[in-house]
């Protein structure tokens, strides 16, 4: 019933607003609710209905479809894309199976380890997978993590960031993807167990074990150590997919020493491609090589799927600059277009940019910073560049000249005829 105005002024039991502050106040047994709280409840229920409907109609893309979308964003790495597509498809099929209530066969979770040089596309692969599947995604740097109780970041903070990516929707977060970069940097310092505490190496591996395997973690919504009295969010990590990545510099030497396949003979022949040799060596990777590198057996056991990424050559880097949907050159061209200017990057300049990235050994990651540096002055004066064309040549990349700025001529009908007549006059 609606509370009469002549009675003692009452308040909403949910938002504490007084009767005169709202349009309606509905009474129940010893409680009251205002029209604003009713509308809020209806909005929440409507949103949950949309999520439920989306879950019902959602279909997992096939490995071929996943790989096809990856091809739109990631250049090369065909084997890695195939492995990831199959692994991710099987992971989310497993989730469907678990949610259906079937338990005749227990399907284990298969987390993934990506091994590849800096700038080879490990992070981009993980990000693109999350985008394809429309699931929450977060990244963490393993080098910033420490065991609980030490200065640094708790592993629970990774789960907090995933919750934030899911807008604190626990059910959604529990189906997300977590990418942990630079796991090679948390390798223990010695192959033999140490009597001293290794809080940023083996200690972090131990801390990651439980959440990677599957546990109900207590996640502090405000970040943990600074707010010890806060309520915790319970998050089940059993169905969260963990993808770990690292460069693992030097692991090729460990593989070579195990297989007694010395590269000295190869090095003597200058015609042999060293990168090709390294690719072949990495194909022989075994669990014992990762153990010798410094990962503990229990941690390796949580990462049953291991795949390697190749070094990117000049041709691949040029393709990355121009072909993908989010290609760097396309992005900069669009930025200039928004300011009514035009950007031209010559083919020879693209090759020079790729060569520069190879020389710096930054892979695809270094391409953007090179172009940012080349275009800094032009972008700084972009307001003056309306109806202007900025051209980047090979000499510009090499630092010999500044970017070439010319006018964009948009002739009228009359001037077009005059220009055509002039062009017809023989030189």
Swiss-Prot record:
This is ATP-dependent Clp protease ATP-binding subunit ClpX. One of its GO terms (cellular component) is HslUV protease complex. Keywords: ATP-binding, Chaperone, Metal-binding, Nucleotide-binding, Zinc. GO terms for molecular function: ATP binding; ATP hydrolysis activity; ATP-dependent protein folding chaperone; protein dimerization activity; unfolded protein binding; zinc ion binding. Belongs to the ClpX chaperone family. Component of the ClpX-ClpP complex. Forms a hexameric ring that, in the presence of ATP, binds to fourteen ClpP subunits assembled into a disk-like structure with a central cavity, resembling the structure of eukaryotic proteasomes. One of its GO terms (biological process) is proteolysis involved in protein catabolic process. NCBIfam families: clpX, PRK05342.1. The lineage of its organism: Bacteria, Pseudomonadati, Pseudomonadota, Alphaproteobacteria, Rickettsiales. It comes from the Bacteria. Zn(2+) binds at residues 12, 15, 34, 37. InterPro entries: AAA+_ATPase (IPR003593), ATP-dep_Clp_protease_ClpX (IPR050052), ATPase_AAA_core (IPR003959), Clp_ATPase_C (IPR019489), Clp_protease_ATP-bd_su_ClpX (IPR004487), ClpX_bact (IPR046425), P-loop_NTPase (IPR027417), Znf_CppX_C4 (IPR010603). It holds the Pfam family ClpB_D2-small. Residues 1-53 form the ClpX-type ZB domain. HAMAP family: ClpX. ATP binds at residues 117-124. ATP-dependent specificity component of the Clp protease. It directs the protease to specific substrates. Can perform chaperone functions in the absence of ClpP. Disulfide bonds: none annotated.
